[in-house]
């Protein structure tokens, strides 16, 4: 059977596991089908276009350890505000990805890895989802506090299981609360706990070193001071994520409101931007403000 250009594009994008591009190609393929005789092909394209379809059915052994999301269906770029500091981080990561691809051609392993640190609620995870959206890669999220196991050696095994996906599939690999396991080895707790933590940290670094150049690693922590120095050296970039100043909060709120075509009073705006609230706290209060406004309209 002679393939059309759209069908060739579909095969290319599916092989690269680019969900968004695969769906766009599938839509083009369905548009050029003159009859429904090829039942299997039509059914496969239709399933691909179904937003519930996931190209990343995880093995049972890592379900609950790792979550993988196609953010093209869930991320609202029009509501997301990128500060100038975060834009610099984003630009650096994108430039570095081009470098890693060139290094891969020379058979040189190099991981595009960034560690984001700072107080909670400053948008570390949301930045990871934004990066996945812009790069058209799946967002693989691993929260280290969820993989700690009381059984001896089990935490290290859980890490190895979770890393299998990122090693085999190019993605944005988000390592959240990385300080939960990779504690500096000079911070002593108990002899048995120290051995287990050391074993876990070594496993993490070994798995980290096996990641392909195509995978982009983002790690997040609130306690960079507790992370093992050998692991810190594996991150090519380290950035502090800080609470927005009042002007940045105002711009963030304004963009969100414009996206949903709503407004709030000047007093509400001042209440939202003043104080030391984090980005997450500000957005939570904004949504409550919007809900209150809509509630008043119902009365």
Regions found by a protein language model. Give the residues of each.
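Pre-Walker A (pre-P-loop) alpha-helix and adjacent loop at the N terminus of AAA/AAA+ ATPase modules
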Residues: 71-113
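Walker A/P-loop
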Residues: 110-142, 160-168
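Structural recognition of the conserved hydrophobic beta-strand(s) that form the central parallel beta-sheet
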Residues: 174-175, 202-206, 215-221
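Conserved AAA+ ATPase small/helical "lid" subdomain
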Residues: 4, 14-15, 22-26, 30, ...
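Substrate-gripping "pore-loop 1 plus following alpha2 helix"
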Residues: 187-209
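Interdomain "pre-motor" coupling segment immediately N-terminal to P-loop NTPase/helicase cores
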Residues: 18-76
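Conserved AAA+ ATPase "SRH/arginine-finger" region at the nucleotide-binding site
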Residues: 236-250
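Short regulatory helix/loop adjacent to the ATP-binding pocket of P-loop NTPases
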Residues: 223-236
